[in-house]
């Protein structure tokens, strides 16, 4: 029997493509509408202003991408993306010292955002039931406060307006989502909004890696110590395709990185707690100038708490919960949201109550990422907040002491590290930290000596001795 149901997805980024690939299994046609023109290859586009900065697809999200779009991981790796084991493939100076490089517990896919988006888009659009409509903006939702029945759109070139009916509209348009305004036009109230704003600014530059370090080189990161009472300053070096390093430095309010090339190098060397990243890039070849971004506010819109919610509309991705990009959780949280919607479709099909149930399930799906990001940011000087979340506002001192104990132990205890890494990669939930074996390991404390210098392996040091000037 022919499936006559249709869906419209607003936004053709990562979240939009993933949800489209999922919806194509439940409806007869999916129309993806985006205001941008998409590049023919792995190039940047206007609608992803942060695409020049480092993006991480943690294993918790990568597995979902592979489940929805089988073969995507191999295609990314074939195009030069790096699969980096966590923690064995990273050299990380945490707030508690150098992380011991235990055997792989999770992983990340490291590549440019342009390559990642293009690959996922190409894989998604192989499905003939999915159509991409470019250079088109959404003007209004069709329907009323009880049911959304489609969208009214305008072609940006011709100016022509038309209506696109749909059984389900999914908004994945990101931080600039129009849903709040569009729902108000239907007579619905504004959702409760939370934000945690550390004032973080981050700056990024691309480098050509030294030839000997162009492959099989670890992710290198230097993190702030939130206990110091100073702005949080960080530096991350991530190997990506084509023998390049993407290097991002960041600082919270009062510790923002400079925008000039010399200032960037100085910040990477002297502005963070260890000069390793600065030393690594000192003799690498710069490929770009510095790009800065201030779009780092953690912001959450609680559509799930509205007293009424229209049938036929779901909001997910950054449009419902956007995180400080320094933690790399946005894409993986969006992937979990797609699974939450899929679960509700499987249980309810298109019966009444689907959209409300899905919106509530999405709120649950993004909650761990929300707590992980905001509980870190809220402790920095000058952080501005609007939240009633008791996990952030009550007993903060006691919670921080527990977090610090777990964080310290995770650097030198493999059992605790595996649990912490699973949580931080969104491969497991907060509840996993309450496992009796993990709690017992926390009580035992660190089990290996603390590294006193960057834990680069002999082969990694050997590849750098001739050119990178690294203190090891």
Curated annotation (Swiss-Prot):
GO biological process, one term: antibiotic biosynthetic process
Pfam families, alphabetized: FAD_binding_3
Mutant lacking the gene: phenotype: Deletion of this gene abolishes production both of lasalocid and of the minor cometabolite iso-lasalocid without leading to accumulation of an identifiable intermediate.
Listed GO MF terms: FAD binding; monooxygenase activity
Enzyme class, UniProt record, top EC level: oxidoreductase
InterPro entries reported for this sequence: FAD-bd, FAD/NAD-bd_sf
Domain of life, source organism: Bacteria
Chain ranges passing through the membrane: none
EC number(s) per entry: 1.14.13.-
Named cofactor requirement(s): FAD
RNA-binding in keyword set: no
Signal peptide limits: none
Keywords on record: Antibiotic biosynthesis, FAD, Flavoprotein, Monooxygenase, Oxidoreductase, Plasmid
Presence of the UniProt keyword Oxidoreductase in the record: yes
Function (record text): May catalyze the stereoselective double epoxidation reaction leading to bisepoxyprelasalocid A, a bisepoxide intermediate in the biosynthesis of the polyether antibiotic lasalocid A.
Full protein name: Putative epoxidase LasC
Taxonomy of the source species: Bacteria, Bacillati, Actinomycetota, Actinomycetes, Kitasatosporales
Gene coding for it: lsd18
């Amino acid at each position: 029997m022919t499936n006559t149901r249709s869906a419209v997805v607003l936004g053709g980024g990562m979240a939009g493509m993933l949800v489209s690939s999922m919806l194509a299994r439940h409806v007869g046609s999916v129309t993806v509408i985006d205001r941008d023109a998409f590049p023919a290859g792995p190039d940047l586009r206007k609608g992803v202003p942060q695409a020049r900065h480092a993006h991480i697809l943690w294993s918790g999200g990568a597995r979902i991408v592979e489940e929805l779009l089988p073969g995507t991981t191999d295609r990314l790796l074939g195009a030069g993306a790096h699969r980096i084991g966590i923690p064995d493939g990273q050299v990380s100076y945490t707030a508690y010292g150098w992380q011991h490089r235990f055997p792989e517990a999770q992983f990340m896919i490291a590549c440019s955002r342009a390559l990642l988006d293009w690959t996922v888009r190409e894989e998604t659009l192989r499905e003939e039931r999915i159509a991409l409509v470019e250079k088109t903006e959404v003007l209004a939702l069709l329907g009323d406060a009880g049911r959304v029945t489609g969208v009214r759109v305008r072609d940006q070139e011709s100016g022509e307006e038309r209506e696109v009916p749909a059984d389900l509209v999914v908004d994945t348009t990101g931080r600039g989502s129009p849903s709040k305004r569009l729902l108000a036009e239907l007579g619905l109230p504004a959702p409760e909004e939370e934000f945690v704003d550390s004032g973080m600014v981050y700056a990024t530059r691309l480098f050509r890696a030294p030839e000997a370090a162009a492959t099989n080189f670890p992710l290198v990161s230097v993190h702030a110590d939130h206990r110091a009472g100073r702005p949080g300053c960080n530096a991350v070096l991530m190997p990506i395709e084509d023998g390049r390093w993407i290097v991002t430095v960041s600082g919270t309010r009062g510790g923002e990185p400079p925008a000039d090339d010399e200032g960037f190098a100085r910040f990477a060397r002297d502005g963070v707690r260890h000069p390793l990243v600065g030393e690594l890039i000192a003799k690498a070849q710069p490929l770009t100038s510095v790009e800065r971004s201030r779009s780092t506010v953690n912001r959450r819109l609680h559509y799930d708490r509205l007293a009424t919610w229209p049938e036929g509309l779901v909001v997910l991705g950054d449009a419902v919960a956007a995180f400080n990009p320094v933690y790399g959780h946005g894409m993986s949280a969006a992937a979990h949201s797609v699974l939450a919607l899929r679960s509700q479709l499987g249980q309810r099909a298109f019966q009444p109550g689907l959209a409300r149930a899905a919106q509530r399930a999405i709120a649950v799906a993004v909650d761990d990422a929300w707590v992980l990001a905001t509980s870190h940011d809220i402790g920095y000087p000058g952080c501005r907040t609007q939240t009633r979340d008791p996990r952030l506002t009550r007993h903060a001192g006691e919670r921080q002491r527990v977090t610090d104990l777990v964080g310290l132990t995770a650097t030198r205890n493999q059992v605790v590290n595996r649990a912490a890494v699973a949580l931080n990669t969104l491969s497991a939930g907060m509840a996993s930290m309450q496992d009796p074996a993990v709690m017992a390991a926390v009580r035992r404390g660190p089990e290996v000596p603390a590294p006193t210098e960057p834990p680069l392996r002999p082969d990694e040091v050997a590849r750098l001795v001739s050119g990178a000037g690294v203190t090891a």
